[in-house]
Amino acid sequence: MNPTTDVLEQRVAALEGGVAAVAVASGQTASAYAIQNLAVAGDNIVSSTDLYGGTHNLLKNRLAQQGIEMLFVNPANPKAFAEASDGRTRAYYAETLPNPKL
């Protein structure tokens, strides 16, 4: 355990009124942790097509290995998110300032 990270996690938990917190080294890791806590094999996530390349790879390839299906939609059509959803949808994923659009 990194003592600096441990202090950060304790302080964030205290600020948020939580019992614990997790600090990670990148946004991509944070995204992976969040999705893996929401979805399991057989579930799906509806995602924008406009993503950082590494995140797109994570969602499309790595999560598929865990049995989590990704459904990619055009973010220019907000209704596409609802249309792609079904009873197995556990989350919607989008980047507010996607890397390809910066």
Where are these regions (language model features)?
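Conserved N-terminal alpha-helix of the aminotransferase class I/II PLP-enzyme fold
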Residues: 1-32, 54-62
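CheY-like receiver
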Residues: 11, 34, 80-84
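Buried hydrophobic positions in well-ordered alpha/beta secondary-structure cores of metabolic enzymes
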Residues: 12, 30, 45, 92-95
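Short helix-loop-beta connector
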Residues: 15-19, 39-42, 87
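Short beta->alpha linker loops
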Residues: 25-26, 50-51, 76, 102
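Conserved PLP-anchoring active-site segment centered on the Schiff-base-forming lysine
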Residues: 37-55, 74
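PLP-dependent aminotransferase-class I/II
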Residues: 57-102
